């Protein structure tokens, strides 16, 4: 069996990113190991996730896009993030949902179907995240 354990996330300032992800987004700090002035490992985990994010200092142009965070209640999660100071975009939904053709329409999917509704935000370094609604977790 294979399991995805960690995704590396490039950041310019580890302390700023650590504050953003723990205080605003609500990630849990798992590791902050800083044995020397030039070596530091910071690992965070989203609530309910088995995959963590490791903050790594990188070239100032390095970015990760479209990291997905799933939730059973997109409206509530978006509101909670906004209340903590995260600039989250408006809701959008796949239209039509059953094909790669087409695009997106404004608002939540009227039927609240799994994998149909989204909202986006980015961290202070420009890494982008997509919140996606789904009511169940496939095994």
Residue ranges with predicted function:
Residues 51-53, 65, 129:
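Short beta-strand segments
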Residues 36-40, 61-63, 97, 113-115:
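Short acidic/glycine-enriched loop/turn segments that link adjacent beta-strands
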Residues 2, 8-51, 59, 76, ...:
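Core segments of cupin and vicinal oxygen chelate
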Residues 69, 78-139:
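Vicinal oxygen chelate
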Residues 55-82:
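Helix-adjacent hinge/juxtasegments
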Residues 8, 45, 56-57, 122, ...:
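Residue-level detector of conserved, well-ordered beta-strand and adjacent loop positions
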Residues 13, 73, 123-125:
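Acidic active-site catalytic centers that drive phospho-/nucleotidyl reactions
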Residues 1-18, 64-67, 132-139:
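N-terminal beta-strand motif that seeds the catalytic metal site of vicinal oxygen chelate
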């Amino acid at each position: 069996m294979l399991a995805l354990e960690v995704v590396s996330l490039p950041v310019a300032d580890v302390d700023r990113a650590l504050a953003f992800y723990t205080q605003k987004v609500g990630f849990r700090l798992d590791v902050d190991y800083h044995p020397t002035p030039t070596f530091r490992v910071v690992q965070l985990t989203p609530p309910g996730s088995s995959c963590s994010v490791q903050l790594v200092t990188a070239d100032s142009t390095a970015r990760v896009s479209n990291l997905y965070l799933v939730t059973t209640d997109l409206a509530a999660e978006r509101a909670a993030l906004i209340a903590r100071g995260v600039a989250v975009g408006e809701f959008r939904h796949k239209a039509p949902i059953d094909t790669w053709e087409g695009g997106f329409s404004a608002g939540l999917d009227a039927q609240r179907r799994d994998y149909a509704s989204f909202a986006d935000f980015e961290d202070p370094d420009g890494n982008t995240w997509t919140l996606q609604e789904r009511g169940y977790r496939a095994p």
